[in-house]
Amino acid sequence: MNKKLLLILLIGLVFLTGCWGKVEIENRGFVVGTAIDLEEKKGNGKYKLVMTNQLINPAAATTPSNAGNAQKGFMNISVDDESLFAASRKMRQLTNLIPYYQHLKVILVSEAVLSQPGLFTDVMDVFVRNHELRRGVKVFVTKDKANKILEYVPEVEKTPSMFLDKLANNGKNAGLLEPKKIDRLQNIFIYERSYFVPRVKLENNKIVYDDVVVVQGSNNQMVGILNAEETKGLLYITSPTKGGSIEANFDGNSINVETTNAKTKIKLTNKDKENLAFSLKVNFEGSIEEHYGQANLLTEKSLVEIEAALEKDIKKMVERTIEKVQKEYKLDVLKFGDTIRRDHYDLWKTIVDNWDRGENYFSKSTVDVKVEANIISTGASNRIKQKGKRDE
């Protein structure tokens, strides 16, 4: 009887206990952004890094933004160490709040970190292993110090991290490349593929997000930049979609055309590994949003000329990007290798180790670019003919 009573009491104690690992919400430091900078390169492959965490300021959350004594919606805490894990531990000594990463939105890594072979992988590995992190955290490279971006005070958001997160989310509709996310980078690291990462910078006290860094897959070291125009070409090749605009010249005047739909198809047309050749076709649809000049846009002749101008400009943009990536960087961030791997796997097995390294078949291949542009609307009041009728 005593044993049964003791057993009942022990079972009851389990239900009476609280959460052993419980941390009260007021003791949590909600980290929404993290910046990693290189402070010093040491010998024996060691580096001193600066880790900056951006925490939400709970006091500011309850203060009206128009109040005279309104506080910043965030606070930044920085520590340096040779180990990011150790730096994270140090962080706890600088605040009474326990860093909580489940609401992390963005990770910013400076170009200086990516300039060192393998360092970017080591940095990201710390975040990949963090069980609190969601796999959709966005990763950006910064032109200068990463923690400087976290000091930017946005007008419409409480924190620069949340502003950058929303800027990236809206980027798809603005014709910008989608950011890399942790789960995607983890897969890239495993297969040692060359890749690009969107870059952000501060210009005239504004965050600018319009170009990318190109990274060698074998050692995860940055090799160069694609500027804003080259990045648009990259977008047409790798991530065509709706959104964004392109400017064309018609009748001596500028025309802005919004992208309503864009698709790209890449095919391997010559399977001789010493003379690999691809065809790349971009199908572009757009509507004219802005036009300066007196030309009548409703005539068939005008539309044909505008479409021809668009085709010429897009083709030039795409070819310039291919030229830079193929001949200067010699790294396949354009996903041509994916076309061979998917459609011609037997061939891929014979060249994979020398695709964009060694013999570098990628840099030796040729690409024939074709663009077909179709204007589907000249504006709200000038709906034009259906494509089928124009083709008659």
Predicted regions and their residues:
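Membrane-proximal alpha-helical signals and transmembrane carboxylates
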Residues: 2, 10-392
